[in-house]
Amino acid sequence: PIMLKSKWCHLHGLSREELVEKGEDPNEPGGYFIINGTEKVLITIEDLASNKFLVEKPSSGTSEYVGKMFSEYGSFKIPHTLEKLKDGIFYLTFTRVKRIPAILIIKALGLLKDEEITRFVSENRQFDEVIINLIEFASIKAEDEALDYVAKKIGITQSKEVRIERMREILDKYLLPHLGIKKEDRIFKAYNLCKMLKKFLRVSREELQVDDKDHYMNKKLKLAGDLLSDLLRLNIKVLIGDLLYNFQRMVKRGKFPTIKNLIRDKLLTQRIYSSMATGTWVSGRKGISQRIQRLNYLEMLSHLQRVVSPLSASQENFEARELHSTHLGRLCPIETPEGT
Protein backbone atom coordinates (compact mmCIF):
# COMPACT_ATOMS: atom_id res chain seq x y z
CA PRO A 1 0.00 0.00 0.00
CA ILE A 2 1.16 3.52 -0.83
CA MET A 3 0.38 6.56 1.30
CA LEU A 4 -1.87 8.99 -0.59
CA LYS A 5 -0.05 12.05 -1.99
CA SER A 6 3.34 10.66 -0.92
CA LYS A 7 6.34 10.74 -3.30
CA TRP A 8 5.35 7.47 -5.07
CA CYS A 9 1.61 8.26 -5.32
CA HIS A 10 0.39 9.42 -8.76
CA LEU A 11 -1.45 12.34 -7.08
CA HIS A 12 1.86 13.73 -5.76
CA GLY A 13 2.58 17.34 -6.77
CA LEU A 14 -0.57 17.84 -8.89
CA SER A 15 -2.24 21.27 -9.03
CA ARG A 16 -5.86 21.82 -7.91
CA GLU A 17 -7.09 21.74 -11.53
CA GLU A 18 -5.27 18.46 -12.27
CA LEU A 19 -6.71 16.89 -9.12
CA VAL A 20 -10.24 17.91 -10.16
CA GLU A 21 -9.63 16.38 -13.62
CA LYS A 22 -8.70 13.08 -11.95
CA GLY A 23 -11.92 13.17 -9.93
CA GLU A 24 -10.16 13.99 -6.63
CA ASP A 25 -11.12 16.55 -4.00
CA PRO A 26 -8.45 19.33 -4.22
CA ASN A 27 -8.77 20.00 -0.44
CA GLU A 28 -8.01 16.36 0.42
CA PRO A 29 -4.78 16.35 2.55
CA GLY A 30 -3.66 12.74 1.88
CA GLY A 31 -1.39 11.03 4.41
CA TYR A 32 -3.47 7.86 4.76
CA PHE A 33 -3.59 4.43 3.08
CA ILE A 34 -6.32 2.52 1.25
CA ILE A 35 -6.49 -1.08 2.49
CA ASN A 36 -9.10 -3.37 0.88
CA GLY A 37 -11.10 -0.29 -0.12
CA THR A 38 -11.10 1.24 3.39
CA GLU A 39 -9.28 4.47 4.22
CA LYS A 40 -6.87 3.75 7.07
CA VAL A 41 -4.68 6.19 8.99
CA LEU A 42 -1.64 5.17 11.06
CA ILE A 43 -1.92 6.97 14.40
CA THR A 44 1.22 8.74 15.63
CA ILE A 45 2.64 7.25 18.85
CA GLU A 46 4.30 9.36 21.52
CA ASP A 47 7.31 7.79 23.21
CA LEU A 48 10.26 8.79 25.40
CA ALA A 49 13.25 9.92 23.34
CA SER A 50 16.02 7.34 23.05
CA ASN A 51 19.72 8.02 23.74
CA LYS A 52 18.89 10.87 26.10
CA PHE A 53 20.00 10.85 29.74
CA LEU A 54 17.26 12.09 32.09
CA VAL A 55 17.64 12.55 35.85
CA GLU A 56 14.51 12.40 38.00
CA LYS A 57 13.37 12.02 41.60
CA PRO A 58 11.79 8.58 42.12
CA SER A 59 8.64 8.34 44.23
CA SER A 60 10.08 5.33 46.07
CA GLY A 61 13.36 3.41 46.29
CA THR A 62 16.72 3.64 48.01
CA SER A 63 18.27 6.53 46.07
CA GLU A 64 17.22 10.17 46.11
CA TYR A 65 17.85 10.72 42.38
CA VAL A 66 17.88 8.25 39.48
CA GLY A 67 19.35 8.81 36.02
CA LYS A 68 17.72 6.84 33.19
CA MET A 69 18.45 6.39 29.53
CA PHE A 70 17.22 4.12 26.73
CA SER A 71 20.10 3.34 24.40
CA GLU A 72 18.67 2.41 21.01
CA TYR A 73 20.59 0.43 18.42
CA GLY A 74 18.71 -0.91 15.40
CA SER A 75 15.52 -2.55 16.57
CA PHE A 76 16.30 -2.96 20.26
CA LYS A 77 16.40 -0.57 23.22
CA ILE A 78 18.49 -1.17 26.32
CA PRO A 79 17.51 0.67 29.52
CA HIS A 80 20.41 2.08 31.56
CA THR A 81 20.04 3.29 35.16
CA LEU A 82 22.53 5.35 37.18
CA GLU A 83 21.97 5.79 40.92
CA LYS A 84 23.82 6.74 44.08
CA LEU A 85 23.12 4.57 47.11
CA LYS A 86 23.60 5.37 50.80
CA ASP A 87 27.22 4.14 50.74
CA GLY A 88 28.06 7.09 48.43
CA ILE A 89 28.97 4.85 45.46
CA PHE A 90 27.49 5.42 41.98
CA TYR A 91 25.97 2.26 40.52
CA LEU A 92 25.14 1.50 36.89
CA THR A 93 22.56 -1.07 35.75
CA PHE A 94 22.01 -2.36 32.19
CA THR A 95 20.73 -5.76 30.90
CA ARG A 96 22.33 -8.56 33.01
CA VAL A 97 24.70 -6.14 34.73
CA LYS A 98 22.91 -5.14 37.92
CA ARG A 99 24.20 -2.35 40.19
CA ILE A 100 27.88 -2.38 39.33
CA PRO A 101 30.01 0.61 40.50
CA ALA A 102 30.14 3.11 37.60
CA ILE A 103 33.84 3.92 38.23
CA LEU A 104 34.69 0.24 37.65
CA ILE A 105 32.84 0.25 34.32
CA ILE A 106 34.75 3.41 33.29
CA LYS A 107 38.05 1.70 34.20
CA ALA A 108 37.01 -1.48 32.37
CA LEU A 109 36.42 0.63 29.24
CA GLY A 110 40.04 1.80 29.29
CA LEU A 111 39.91 5.16 31.11
CA LEU A 112 42.23 4.21 33.99
CA LYS A 113 43.87 7.33 35.44
CA ASP A 114 42.00 8.89 38.35
CA GLU A 115 43.15 12.33 37.25
CA GLU A 116 41.62 11.81 33.77
CA ILE A 117 38.32 10.56 35.20
CA THR A 118 38.00 13.64 37.47
CA ARG A 119 38.90 15.90 34.53
CA PHE A 120 36.27 14.35 32.24
CA VAL A 121 33.59 14.53 34.92
CA SER A 122 34.35 18.21 35.46
CA GLU A 123 37.26 20.24 34.10
CA ASN A 124 37.06 23.33 36.25
CA ARG A 125 36.32 21.86 39.70
CA GLN A 126 36.38 18.66 41.69
CA PHE A 127 33.37 16.83 43.04
CA ASP A 128 33.99 15.23 46.45
CA GLU A 129 31.56 12.42 45.56
CA VAL A 130 33.75 11.34 42.63
CA ILE A 131 36.91 11.37 44.77
CA ILE A 132 35.19 9.08 47.33
CA ASN A 133 34.37 6.64 44.50
CA LEU A 134 37.93 6.79 43.14
CA ILE A 135 39.48 6.11 46.57
CA GLU A 136 37.13 3.13 47.04
CA PHE A 137 38.49 1.45 43.88
CA ALA A 138 42.04 2.89 43.91
CA SER A 139 43.54 -0.63 44.07
CA ILE A 140 42.23 -1.45 40.58
CA LYS A 141 44.81 -0.01 38.19
CA ALA A 142 44.51 -2.19 35.05
CA GLU A 143 41.72 -2.70 32.54
CA ASP A 144 41.79 -6.51 32.96
CA GLU A 145 41.48 -6.22 36.75
CA ALA A 146 38.38 -4.04 36.40
CA LEU A 147 36.88 -6.41 33.80
CA ASP A 148 37.54 -9.45 36.00
CA TYR A 149 36.04 -7.73 39.08
CA VAL A 150 32.83 -6.84 37.18
CA ALA A 151 32.63 -10.34 35.61
CA LYS A 152 32.80 -11.96 39.07
CA LYS A 153 30.15 -9.56 40.38
CA ILE A 154 27.64 -10.56 37.68
CA GLY A 155 28.33 -14.26 38.14
CA ILE A 156 30.49 -15.31 35.17
CA THR A 157 32.28 -18.39 36.53
CA GLN A 158 34.72 -19.62 33.83
CA SER A 159 38.51 -19.18 33.78
CA LYS A 160 39.96 -15.66 34.05
CA GLU A 161 40.69 -15.27 30.29
CA VAL A 162 37.17 -16.40 29.32
CA ARG A 163 35.62 -14.15 31.99
CA ILE A 164 37.47 -11.09 30.70
CA GLU A 165 36.57 -11.88 27.07
CA ARG A 166 32.89 -12.41 27.93
CA MET A 167 32.84 -9.14 29.87
CA ARG A 168 34.37 -7.24 26.94
CA GLU A 169 31.66 -8.68 24.69
CA ILE A 170 28.91 -7.58 27.10
CA LEU A 171 30.35 -4.04 27.33
CA ASP A 172 30.66 -3.79 23.53
CA LYS A 173 27.20 -5.11 22.74
CA TYR A 174 24.98 -3.94 25.58
CA LEU A 175 26.57 -0.83 27.15
CA LEU A 176 25.44 2.32 25.30
CA PRO A 177 25.22 0.49 21.92
CA HIS A 178 24.09 3.69 20.14
CA LEU A 179 27.71 4.95 20.47
CA GLY A 180 28.98 1.88 18.60
CA ILE A 181 29.65 -1.80 19.25
CA LYS A 182 33.31 -1.98 18.18
CA LYS A 183 36.47 -2.18 20.29
CA GLU A 184 37.53 1.39 19.39
CA ASP A 185 34.19 2.81 20.65
CA ARG A 186 34.94 1.82 24.27
CA ILE A 187 36.77 5.03 25.14
CA PHE A 188 33.84 7.16 23.85
CA LYS A 189 31.54 5.16 26.10
CA ALA A 190 33.82 5.95 29.06
CA TYR A 191 33.73 9.70 28.22
CA ASN A 192 29.95 9.53 27.94
CA LEU A 193 29.61 7.82 31.33
CA CYS A 194 31.69 10.67 32.82
CA LYS A 195 29.31 13.20 31.25
CA MET A 196 26.32 11.28 32.65
CA LEU A 197 27.96 11.34 36.11
CA LYS A 198 28.51 15.09 35.83
CA LYS A 199 24.85 15.76 34.99
CA PHE A 200 23.71 13.43 37.80
CA LEU A 201 25.94 15.26 40.31
CA ARG A 202 24.78 18.70 39.20
CA VAL A 203 21.11 17.71 39.51
CA SER A 204 21.68 16.11 42.94
CA ARG A 205 23.39 19.34 44.11
CA GLU A 206 20.39 21.29 42.77
CA GLU A 207 22.52 23.24 40.29
CA LEU A 208 20.37 21.87 37.47
CA GLN A 209 16.65 21.17 37.54
CA VAL A 210 15.28 17.64 37.48
CA ASP A 211 14.37 16.62 33.90
CA ASP A 212 10.71 16.89 32.94
CA LYS A 213 9.64 13.66 31.22
CA ASP A 214 6.58 15.34 29.71
CA HIS A 215 8.56 18.14 28.03
CA TYR A 216 8.44 17.62 24.27
CA MET A 217 12.22 17.97 24.10
CA ASN A 218 12.40 14.58 25.86
CA LYS A 219 9.81 12.88 23.65
CA LYS A 220 9.79 11.47 20.17
CA LEU A 221 6.85 10.85 17.88
CA LYS A 222 6.68 7.67 15.84
CA LEU A 223 5.12 8.60 12.52
CA ALA A 224 3.84 6.26 9.79
CA GLY A 225 7.38 5.69 8.45
CA ASP A 226 8.78 4.59 11.84
CA LEU A 227 5.78 2.34 12.50
CA LEU A 228 6.05 0.70 9.07
CA SER A 229 9.82 0.18 9.46
CA ASP A 230 9.15 -1.66 12.77
CA LEU A 231 6.55 -3.80 11.03
CA LEU A 232 8.81 -4.54 8.05
CA ARG A 233 11.75 -5.42 10.30
CA LEU A 234 9.65 -7.95 12.23
CA ASN A 235 8.15 -9.50 9.10
CA ILE A 236 11.50 -9.83 7.33
CA LYS A 237 12.67 -11.88 10.33
CA VAL A 238 9.55 -14.07 9.92
CA LEU A 239 10.29 -14.40 6.18
CA ILE A 240 13.91 -15.47 6.85
CA GLY A 241 12.70 -18.02 9.42
CA ASP A 242 10.17 -19.39 6.92
CA LEU A 243 12.83 -19.54 4.19
CA LEU A 244 15.21 -21.52 6.44
CA TYR A 245 12.44 -23.92 7.46
CA ASN A 246 11.46 -24.59 3.81
CA PHE A 247 15.10 -25.07 2.81
CA GLN A 248 15.82 -27.58 5.60
CA ARG A 249 12.59 -29.46 4.87
CA MET A 250 13.41 -29.84 1.16
CA VAL A 251 17.06 -30.79 1.77
CA LYS A 252 15.92 -33.54 4.19
CA ARG A 253 13.79 -34.96 1.37
CA GLY A 254 16.86 -35.03 -0.85
CA LYS A 255 15.79 -32.13 -3.11
CA PHE A 256 17.93 -29.09 -3.83
CA PRO A 257 15.41 -26.25 -4.13
CA THR A 258 15.60 -23.07 -6.21
CA ILE A 259 15.17 -19.67 -4.54
CA LYS A 260 11.78 -19.30 -6.26
CA ASN A 261 10.46 -22.47 -4.59
CA LEU A 262 11.80 -21.43 -1.18
CA ILE A 263 10.22 -17.99 -0.84
CA ARG A 264 6.50 -17.71 -0.26
CA ASP A 265 6.09 -14.47 -2.19
CA LYS A 266 2.77 -13.52 -0.59
CA LEU A 267 3.92 -13.98 3.03
CA LEU A 268 5.47 -10.52 3.60
CA THR A 269 2.71 -8.63 1.76
CA GLN A 270 -0.09 -10.52 3.48
CA ARG A 271 1.33 -9.96 6.96
CA ILE A 272 1.82 -6.21 6.37
CA TYR A 273 -1.68 -5.88 4.86
CA SER A 274 -3.16 -7.85 7.76
CA SER A 275 -1.53 -5.57 10.38
CA MET A 276 -2.67 -2.45 8.55
CA ALA A 277 -6.21 -3.81 8.15
CA THR A 278 -6.67 -4.96 11.77
CA GLY A 279 -4.51 -2.33 13.53
CA THR A 280 -2.58 -4.97 15.54
CA TRP A 281 1.10 -3.97 15.50
CA VAL A 282 4.51 -5.16 16.66
CA SER A 283 4.61 -6.27 20.34
CA GLY A 284 0.84 -6.75 20.39
CA ARG A 285 -0.22 -3.10 20.36
CA LYS A 286 -3.75 -2.58 19.08
CA GLY A 287 -5.50 0.35 17.42
CA ILE A 288 -2.48 1.72 15.52
CA SER A 289 -4.28 1.64 12.17
CA GLN A 290 -7.76 3.23 12.32
CA ARG A 291 -10.52 3.91 9.86
CA ILE A 292 -10.69 7.64 9.07
CA GLN A 293 -13.67 9.46 10.57
CA ARG A 294 -15.19 11.68 7.91
CA LEU A 295 -17.99 13.31 9.87
CA ASN A 296 -16.67 16.67 8.65
CA TYR A 297 -13.44 18.11 7.25
CA LEU A 298 -12.10 19.28 10.64
CA GLU A 299 -12.67 15.90 12.27
CA MET A 300 -10.78 14.21 9.44
CA LEU A 301 -7.82 16.61 9.82
CA SER A 302 -7.91 16.08 13.57
CA HIS A 303 -7.89 12.28 13.12
CA LEU A 304 -4.89 12.42 10.78
CA GLN A 305 -2.92 14.43 13.37
CA ARG A 306 -3.92 12.45 16.45
CA VAL A 307 -1.21 11.41 18.90
CA VAL A 308 -1.60 8.39 21.20
CA SER A 309 0.27 8.13 24.49
CA PRO A 310 1.91 4.75 25.32
CA LEU A 311 0.28 4.68 28.78
CA SER A 312 -2.58 2.23 29.20
CA ALA A 313 -5.89 3.43 30.63
CA SER A 314 -5.23 1.59 33.91
CA GLN A 315 -1.95 3.41 34.64
CA GLU A 316 -2.39 6.39 36.92
CA ASN A 317 -0.06 9.13 35.76
CA PHE A 318 -1.76 12.47 35.98
CA GLU A 319 1.15 14.64 34.81
CA ALA A 320 1.49 12.69 31.56
CA ARG A 321 -2.19 13.28 30.81
CA GLU A 322 -2.14 17.02 31.40
CA LEU A 323 -1.57 19.55 28.65
CA HIS A 324 2.06 20.68 28.64
CA SER A 325 3.11 24.13 27.45
CA THR A 326 5.41 22.50 24.86
CA HIS A 327 2.37 20.94 23.09
CA LEU A 328 1.45 24.41 21.84
CA GLY A 329 2.03 24.71 18.10
CA ARG A 330 3.19 21.09 17.85
CA LEU A 331 0.09 19.04 18.58
CA CYS A 332 -3.42 19.51 17.25
CA PRO A 333 -5.18 21.74 19.83
CA ILE A 334 -8.37 19.62 19.60
CA GLU A 335 -6.51 16.37 20.31
CA THR A 336 -4.32 15.92 23.37
CA PRO A 337 -2.25 12.70 23.58
CA GLU A 338 -5.15 11.23 25.56
CA GLY A 339 -7.43 11.63 22.54
CA THR A 340 -10.01 13.87 24.25
Residue ranges and their predicted role:
Residues 1-303, 307-310, 324, 337:
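N-terminal non-catalytic structural scaffold regions of very large proteins
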Residues 27-28, 318, 328-329:
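Short beta-strand-initiation
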Residues 315-324:
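Short, basic/aromatic recognition patches
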Residues 331-338:
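Conserved helicase core region in the C-terminal RecA-like lobe
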